């Protein structure tokens, strides 16, 4: 399950989405995430899902690879679903002892789960189709106006990219530690959910040690290559908007306008 996390990974390719400017994908992803928290009806989620699957088709990233990332957060999605299902008051659909399911709770639980799925897939598409170097350059370019007020845009962009890239690295390291512990007789599968959580505690110390070791190796490698911050650095491949980026922005504007109209005039609310 841990190795199934796709957020932070890059899937090599030469699709239309891969060739888009990193800034275009970052801005589109941010607006997409904001829109997901604004949309409030079934048609909005349906249109969002259709647009997302169109982007996936254009990216040529296998659906199996993308949906694999959902298995790692299945428990979070399931917990959110159950929490909304039983904790929201409203018109009662089913009642047994202290458990009550309402129409409003069922609706909110379903759409909250859909929202989480769309958030995870949409965020993964950005990292799967953008090289870490391009992601760093894009973030730095977007944050560069704030450098006039003393904000270290290059350092912040680099930290965010490294943190994002380290997610699959740490998950892979966790998987190795679990297998090593199991080879020594450790049991992480038996018991209830609380017992399983307690069984994971011994993994924290070796995981932290491994994380610090990898961070130290990365720092030494950057220092050996003469890294001294963003000041005075040039780019081998400077970011430049192309015709496809302008088309992508136009499609994004049409999508946002459509979502605004759907959310405003189609009053089939999900909560």
What would you call each of these model-derived segments?
Residues 14, 37, 60-65, 96, ...:
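Membrane-helix interfacial "entry" motifs
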Residues 69-77, 113, 117, 207, ...:
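Loop-to-transmembrane-helix entry motif
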Residues 51-61, 76-79:
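Alpha-helical transmembrane segments and their membrane-interface exit regions
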Residues 25, 63-74, 248:
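Alpha-helical transmembrane segments and their helix-start/interface "positive-inside/aromatic belt" motifs
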Residues 1-42, 50-57, 144-151, 155-158, ...:
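Transmembrane alpha-helix interface motif
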Residues 73-186:
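Juxtamembrane/interface alpha-helical elements of multi-pass membrane proteins
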């Amino acid at each position: 399950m841990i190795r199934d996390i796709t957020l932070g990974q890059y899937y090599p390719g030469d699709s239309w989405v891969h060739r888009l400017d990193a800034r275009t994908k970052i801005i589109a992803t941010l607006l997409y995430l904001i829109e997901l928290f604004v949309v409030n009806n079934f048609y909005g989620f349906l249109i969002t899902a259709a647009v997302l699957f169109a982007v996936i088709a254009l990216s040529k990233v296998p659906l199996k690879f993308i949906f694999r990332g959902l298995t790692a957060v299945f428990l979070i999605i399931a917990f959110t679903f159950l929490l909304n299902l039983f904790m929201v008051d409203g018109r009662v659909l089913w009642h047994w002892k202290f458990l009550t399911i309402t129409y409003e709770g069922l609706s909110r639980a379903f759409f909250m789960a859909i929202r989480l799925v769309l958030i995870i897939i949409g965020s993964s598409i950005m990292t799967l189709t953008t090289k870490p170097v391009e992601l760093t350059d894009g973030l730095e370019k977007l944050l560069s106006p704030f450098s006039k007020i003393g904000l270290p845009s290059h350092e912040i962009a680099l930290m965010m990219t490294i943190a994002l890239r380290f997610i699959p690295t740490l998950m892979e390291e966790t998987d190795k530690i679990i297998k090593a512990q199991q080879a020594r007789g450790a049991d992480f599968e038996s018991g209830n959910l609380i017992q399983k959580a307690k069984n994971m505690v011994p993994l924290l110390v070796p995981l932290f040690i491994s994380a610090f070791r990898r961070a130290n190796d990365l720092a030494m490698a950057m220092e050996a290559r003469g890294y001294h911050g963003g000041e005075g650095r040039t780019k081998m491949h400077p970011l430049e908007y192309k015709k496809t980026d302008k088309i992508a922005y136009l499609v994004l504007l049409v999508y946002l306008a459509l979502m605004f109209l759907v959310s405003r005039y189609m009053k089939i609310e999900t909560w």
